[in-house]
Amino acid sequence: MTDSNRTVLITGAAQGLGRAMGIGLLERGFSVAAVDRDANGLCALREQVGAGPKLEGFVADLTDFDAAKLAAEVEQRFGRIDILINNAGIGQGQVRPDYHAHPPKFYEVTPRQWSRAIAVNANAIFLLSRAVVKPMIDRKWGRIINITTSLGTMLHGGSTPYGPSKASAEALSSVMAADLEGTGVTVNVIIPGGAVNTPMIPAEAPFARDALLQPEVMLPPLLWLVSPAADNVTGKRFLGTSWDADLASDAAAEKAGAPIGWKDLAVLPIKPAF
């Protein structure tokens, strides 16, 4: 199947990383189901790129949604879902806009803030992946690409709830890759490799916007992962900043990639004999 016949469902598609990835995929002939809670942002995306029948917006708030219903609506519109990009995220700005200068202690985070981050950054990945994966398995081809964050961000003080919720997504990605091994459906992670110039970084942040990474940093690893060259690549995480455009794609992927999570530190528990 050619790119022009592949359909991508991408969450958080109205702005930031999701918008850049969606546009990049549209430009290469993919059909894109753009999911976001921001209806105006989805309209603006369509106005920017046109794309005719290749682009359709779906309004959904991932803190409270029916994943099976959303997947069915996308399949009804496009016929199938070949690629799922779990990109939507809630950052630390929901706790307080100046979190870079004054990182919140975990006990300063409200239960609602915790629940919202877990809902979007972790639960939605599980729910949507579960909703779309069985037809992928039946077709013996599929891609699930999860956007997490740096391992350091997951663990350092002041990162609650963003860091722990992304750590959950990272661990889930590793489990999903193992569960789907040999099915033709791959699971991989992409991260930018640093702070990115998106609305997730509040205006109060002490950064010059042009000094931040730009959202298009995600495109080289993404476009490689959805290509036939990556048919047998699963359980890996790729840093956009480490992708070397001067190398051949496979060599660039080798340089930018590593196993998902922290497998080099993992020791499997001793299992009782049966």
What feature does the model see in each segment?
Residues 2-33:
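Canonical Rossmann dinucleotide-binding motif of NAD(H)/NADP(H)-dependent dehydrogenases/reductases
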Residues 28-44:
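Conserved glycine-rich Rossmann-like NAD(P)H-binding loop of the short-chain dehydrogenase/reductase
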Residues 46, 50, 56-59, 64-79:
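Conserved amphipathic alpha-helix within the SDR
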Residues 90, 102-126, 141, 145, ...:
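Catalytic Tyr-X3-Lys loop
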Residues 129, 165:
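Active-site helix of classical SDR
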Residues 134, 178-179:
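Alpha-helical segment proximal to the catalytic Tyr-Lys
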Residues 155-164, 175:
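Active-site loop-to-helix junction immediately N-terminal to the catalytic Tyr of the SDR YXXXK motif
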Residues 182, 189-190, 207-274:
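C-terminal helical subdomain
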